[in-house]
Amino acid sequence: MKQQWQFLILCLLVLFLTVDSRGRRLLSDDVNDTALLTAFKQTSIKSDPTNFLGNWRYGSGRDPCTWRGVSCSSDGRVIGLDLRNGGLTGTLNLNNLTALSNLRSLYLQGNNFSSGDSSSSSGCSLEVLDLSSNSLTDSSIVDYVFSTCLNLVSVNFSHNKLAGKLKSSPSASNKRITTVDLSNNRFSDEIPETFIADFPNSLKHLDLSGNNVTGDFSRLSFGLCENLTVFSLSQNSISGDRFPVSLSNCKLLETLNLSRNSLIGKIPGDDYWGNFQNLRQLSLAHNLYSGEIPPELSLLCRTLEVLDLSGNSLTGQLPQSFTSCGSLQSLNLGNNKLSGDFLSTVVSKLSRITNLYLPFNNISGSVPISLTNCSNLRVLDLSSNEFTGEVPSGFCSLQSSSVLEKLLIANNYLSGTVPVELGKCKSLKTIDLSFNALTGLIPKEIWTLPKLSDLVMWANNLTGGIPESICVDGGNLETLILNNNLLTGSLPESISKCTNMLWISLSSNLLTGEIPVGIGKLEKLAILQLGNNSLTGNIPSELGNCKNLIWLDLNSNNLTGNLPGELASQAGLVMPGSVSGKQFAFVRNEGGTDCRGAGGLVEFEGIRAERLEHFPMVHSCPKTRIYSGMTMYMFSSNGSMIYLDLSYNAVSGSIPLGYGAMGYLQVLNLGHNLLTGTIPDSFGGLKAIGVLDLSHNDLQGFLPGSLGGLSFLSDLDVSNNNLTGPIPFGGQLTTFPLTRYANNSGLCGVPLPPCSSGSRPTRSHAHPKKQSIATGMSAGIVFSFMCIVMLIMALYRARKVQKKEKQREKYIESLPTSGSSSWKLSSVHEPLSINVATFEKPLRKLTFAHLLEATNGFSADSMIGSGGFGDVYKAKLADGSVVAIKKLIQVTGQGDREFMAEMETIGKIKHRNLVPLLGYCKIGEERLLVYEYMKYGSLETVLHEKTKKGGIFLDWSARKKIAIGAARGLAFLHHSCIPHIIHRDMKSSNVLLDQDFVARVSDFGMARLVSALDTHLSVSTLAGTPGYVPPEYYQSFRCTAKGDVYSYGVILLELLSGKKPIDPEEFGEDNNLVGWAKQLYREKRGAEILDPELVTDKSGDVELLHYLKIASQCLDDRPFKRPTMIQVMTMFKELVQVDTENDSLDEFLLKETPLVEESRDKEP
């Protein structure tokens, strides 16, 4: 309180003493500067954890020029303030600093300032302002600075969260500004046509990259731009098929970056490029350009140093005219459809080229030996083409001192041996020749390259072994990836000298001998893969010393001894980062014992997905799933191992209790060993576990009840042990197939036969010799009599039940059979009175027979819908209540898991915008799901069959309510459920409408849990429904939350247009709703997309166009540009002044709890 009064008095003193009624200065300038700096500290700094401003103390004799970050002029006035990377947090009130009349430079980047008040300053003398890398959100600060600080030369607002529309440019009074950086914010909407032209002619550098601004590029005006040298619009949503004419006015332009937008058509040709006489860097990468590279582009060759056209759909080859590009140093044409011989005819003549990137094209033939003429070449990437022949041997000839650092020719069709001449490339750091057909030894000269850090040659037919001299002369090697070859011999002890090693992958070779204990000295080692070899001996306990080890795969060897408890010694201590950002693919084995181990991790840089799908480790297993992406750590500083596979060895002893402390472990496979003892109760600490395989051992005792709390567990196998007792009820343990518990004679309970209800056997006691024989005989007679009575009663009851069963079966046989699929009950041993497992109390006495009766034997008359995973029937129960029953189709090897996954996904989730699962039933091969019945059926039916007799017309108010409800339900699945849920088949037929027309998201038949293992979900077939499938699914087959967002965008577009996603009569055979709408939207004809029946509504078309814009963002072809469903809800909230009943967007809250229950009476 005392400090607050002191601050108030200080502010009043500054206000009163600075200027008297006649304008005379009564307080010295230096005191005024001190007061303003102190006011800034008091009002803007809420947290200073490192005491960065510790010496900022106000008082008599305090000189601010001695304060940290403050610089002063010779007369003691504050002219500069540099607080960059100070760890400061607070609300930035910029006017306290702009009031410093002599302040010329202000650097606050790298802190955590949020937006504050910046509207009341009377002036600003700043010349340099850097507020980058903070948490600013209010874009009005940009307008304030542009209109107030008239002496600005450089301003940087990059890497904040500034949102809204780009509005004003600097005032015309500002004649000095040269640099403006607004990159990596959240600016959106269409960029004003004159935004760039309105900048003063002094402007040299303008960076708008990393936002979401839209508009037709050809309509932008660049004005005179006579001094503009750097312009970037990269990573936005700019469209158009032409360049603006006024851009050619920028004669001094040196860097033009338009990458990662939606520019279409062909790259401009003619004489357009001849206007740029100083252009050094041009990037048109990752747009939608097609056709051939125009020869006229070579008009830039006199000055061009960097050209990036990657990530388009360009065809043909590099024109011959590019041989004149004598200044070109970096050329990136990767990820196109180029072909031809331009490498030898054009590229080999570019003498100054240093970086050449051509991966993922269609270039065939031999790798031209003429490329060795490029003596300055540092990086050569020819991965994923169609090259044949041998690896050229002349890159590092004796005549030239090669500077080659990276040689990447993975995923081609090269044969022959690895050239020994590569050993002369003394600058070589990375060699990747993976996925070819190379044979022979790896030359010893390569192993001794002084700078070699990455040796990657997996998936070849290489022979020989790892030399004893590895890393003897230095430990620069970081990645050694030689899996899936024919390597022999043992691992040398000298591998312990590779002190920088991060990733060792030698799986699937012919290695023998023991694992060197010295590997435990590799503190940086993160991934060790030695599976599928013939290694012997014990698992070294020293591996527990590897402080960064997160992935250990030793499966399918001949290892013996006990499980080392030391493997868990780093639990809670592992630090992230050592292999972050590396491209990988994980091939998960889901085919049981036909393929050994849980799967295989492979380096995936430069490999086509379709090539991997045909790799033996994939197609030789009955069922596999491929996960791919970038390595990311899920912890900050308290991590543990995430993958441990020691299966198919001869390891014995008990399972160490400490393994349960590995809280981030996702896969633990100890199956097919000789383990004894019990399953540790500490396994309840494996909170992230997704796969747990303890099968084919000699484990005894009970299944720990703690396993029931493992909410991420998606695959459990404890079969072929000696386990006893009941399977713990609760969690997911009862949802796994019977085979996962098989051959444990003492186990019982769901899904195995029920446990005996009789009393447990008691111990026998010896009777005294003198015990009365008569007493024993009497007891025997009484016992026999009781047994006879009980037997008679049991026979009577059994006869009564049998009679009742026959009556019910006779009735059921009289029912018509389903017209959709045949029933498979002939071999069913369960009685038809088997109970339906339910999640709702009112249904707890429901049986399978009741369901048969309620649906008239699942007759065609009762069927109300059909989906990709089964038919849906309407069932009226005996009490008059109505439910919907989905009868899942049977898919070999998948039906049970789809059924179990759906139960676990839906059964524990309650939300007013989700269709609740009431119960389930499994009998024979039939799988049934019982849902709450939705009165008005699907949105698809209501929306697109409104013209039929009795159809319902949805006005805009109803459609808006449905759009918001469906978004809320999907956002709940994506963000609130633990684990998160990806729908995978979001469409209008899966949005159901209840009696109040509230939207309910349904049909999780294709859903998968995003567990710790399933960060990206890969499937063997394309997920989703045509018309709703995002474009990236056709390339990667990976299902993501952003894919669901795209599908939701289609639903929103349906609501706005009233049109079906696919309608050949409306859009033609080669187009659909999305393509049609995008074309109109690009042409500024968005109003033509809207359903005419909606435009006449009282809301008008303005609000509709806002919703259309949200749909457009959801339908962006680039997943990273799409909003999350939370952001969609936020945009709805900004648009809607919610006055409809029970539809408050303000109360949309996310509850991150393992089991999410939300009352339907409570507003989300």
UniProtKB/Swiss-Prot annotation:
Annotated family: Belongs to the protein kinase superfamily. Ser/Thr protein kinase family.
Free-text tissue specificity from the UniProt record: Predominantly expressed in vascular tissues. Expressed only during postembryonic development with a very discrete pattern of expression, preferentially in the two protophloem cell files at the elongation zone of the root. The expression in these two cell files attenuates as the phloem cells differentiate in the upper root. In cotyledons and leaves, it is expressed in phloem cells, starting at the cotyledons and shoot apex, moving toward the basal part of the leaves, where the expression is weak. Expressed in the secondary and tertiary veins and in the upper part of the cotyledons and leaves.
Residue(s) carrying Phosphothreonine: T847, T855
Protein name in the entry: Receptor-like protein kinase BRI1-like 3
SMART domains attached to this UniProt entry: LRR_TYP, S_TKc
LRR repeats: 77-98, 102-123, 125-146, 151-173, 176-197, 202-224, 227-248, 252-274, 278-300, 303-325, 327-347, 352-375, 376-397, 403-424, 427-448, 451-473, 476-498, 500-523, 524-546, 548-570, 640-662, 664-686, 688-711, 712-734
Entry annotated with the keyword Nucleotidyltransferase: no
Cytoplasmic topology ranges: 794-1164
PANTHER family: LEUCINE RICH REPEAT FAMILY PROTEIN, EXPRESSED (PTHR48053), RECEPTOR-LIKE PROTEIN KINASE BRI1-LIKE 3 (PTHR48053:SF48)
Residues modified to Phosphoserine: S1020
Main location: membrane
Record: glycosylation sites: 32, 96, 112, 156, 212, 227, 257, 362, 373, 461, 532, 558, 638, 722, 743
Classification lineage: Eukaryota, Viridiplantae, Streptophyta, Embryophyta, Tracheophyta
Localization of this protein: Cell membrane
Provenance organism: Arabidopsis thaliana
